[in-house]
Amino acid sequence: MKYIYIINGRADKAPKYKELFEQLKQNPHPYDLYTTMGEGDATRYVRVYCDLHPNEEVCFVACGGDGIINEVASGIVGFQDKQMAILFIGGSTADFLECYPGRDFRDVKAMLEGTTQSVDIIKVNDSYSINVCNFGFDSTVAAHANSLISNGVEPHKAFRRGVAYALLTSRFNRIRVEVDGQRIRHRLLLLCTLANGVQVGSEFRCAPYAKNDDGLIEVCYLRVMSLLRFLLTMNAYRKGEHLTHKFFKRKVIYRQAREVVVSSKDLFDICLDGEIIPGSLFNIKILPKAISLRLPTIKQQQP
């Protein structure tokens, strides 16, 4: 098995990869390094490599957080004999890794000694989401937080500021949602998450029951509610208790689905693993077990 480590080419990320290079020296194995040249380049590189080497067994290692994880996963969809792995080195957030508590995603040796699992991915028009796609209040939070993070604000602080901004600007969203052909009949929504993973925004457990290998999208639709009610329930949403919390009663619509259609007369943003995509019509479906993911060994307990 050949390994290709894909690292972010941004200058501010370079110091964070010293740990990776040291681990590679300590764990000799056949590998190449690829440094991305910009947003979307990891997906392009992986697809081109797979096209040129259709029969080669290779594992693409996404070195970073949710952004590069999404790009590598998007690149290997549809190719045989290709795996991906994740090293959370050099990234800002890694919500997708919350699906695997106890796994050591910072250790090269643990990755090399790991096992593979086939996981689902969500297709959104011609793009993909391996963790969570969301719109309404959530995508406004993400767009504002992304802007702050790019200016050096810590992710947790950025997302909390994003929440404050969205409270003022994005609590009433006229977006139509159809789940497996059935329309959710409410004129306005607060937010909606379509989840393969369990967490979004660094701390919000939007889909506590999600399993990323069951062939289903977890649909959580929150109806419009008063500002006071939303503020009172924010902590429950953060903890993943919104599906059972009394203050969310009659405000949450929860479904499991294979296909979802989202549309509006106006342009709106949908967020795919942190990437913001504008549009007015999104056809969304689950691709079961489309990705072969190498999982690292479980962290050793300290005596």
Q: Over which residues does each language-model region extend?
A:
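Small-residue-rich beta-alpha loop regions that form the catalytic core of phosphotransfer
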Residues: K2-V153
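Generic preference for hydrophobic
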Residues: Y5, L33, V177, V219-Y221
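Short, glycine/serine-rich, charged loops/turns that create anion-binding
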Residues: R10-A11, G91, N196-Q199, V224
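Short solvent-exposed loop/turn micro-motifs enriched in small/polar/acidic residues
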Residues: P54-N55, E113-T116, L168-S170, R185, ...
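Short, acidic/polar N-cap/turn motifs at the starts of alpha helices
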Residues: Q117-I121, F172-R174, L189, A207, ...
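A residue-level signal for conserved active-site and pocket-lining positions in enzyme catalytic cores
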Residues: I122, V141, C192, V219, ...
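ATP/pyrophosphate-binding catalytic subdomain of soluble kinases
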Residues: N125, S129-L216
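ATP/nucleoside-binding phosphotransfer catalytic cores, i.e., glycine-rich phosphate-binding loops
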Residues: V179-G181, H186, K211, Y221-P303
